[in-house]
Amino acid sequence: MKTFTAKPSNIKREWLLIDATDKTLGRLATEVAMILRGKNKPEYTPHMDTGDYVVIVNAEKVAVTGNKRKAKTYYHHTGYIGGIKSVSFEKLIATHPERAIEKAVRGMLPRTPLGRTMFKKLKVYAGEAHPHTAQQPKAHNI
């Protein structure tokens, strides 16, 4: 029997809606990364983007275990000499709550052009409202 490979014309993408309220950040990010890659589908093909679109709401209510709310630190560099910046999880959630989930999921996707196209299918919103009602996303429980 020949190995199955998905064809771009045969890939059916769905829109999934996930509520991040009281979900642990890492466990949520793992499930979302699997959906974005398409590993939850039988037609998964490693060199193709077979994943679904994911809309995450209530990003500001995501949970972390232990002392991570105060102790977890995110770093980025401005590009200038001595330009390393850091922000705690607590401050990041207060200012840009969607970035914490985006950074967690981004770290679980491949660091290739294919991984970047997979990441573009992730839509994260701080509150309950989102502009994707026309796509009729299906509620997905984690």
From Swiss-Prot:
InterPro entries: Ribosomal_uL13, Ribosomal_uL13_bac-type, Ribosomal_uL13_CS, Ribosomal_uL13_sf. PROSITE patterns: RIBOSOMAL_L13. This protein is one of the early assembly proteins of the 50S ribosomal subunit, although it is not seen to bind rRNA by itself. It is important during the early stages of 50S assembly. Part of the 50S ribosomal subunit. This is Large ribosomal subunit protein uL13. Gene3D superfamilies: Ribosomal protein L13. The keyword Electron transport does not apply. One of its GO terms (molecular function) is mRNA binding. It comes from the Bacteria. Belongs to the universal ribosomal protein uL13 family. Keywords: Ribonucleoprotein, Ribosomal protein. One of its GO terms (biological process) is negative regulation of translation. GO terms for cellular component: cytosolic large ribosomal subunit.
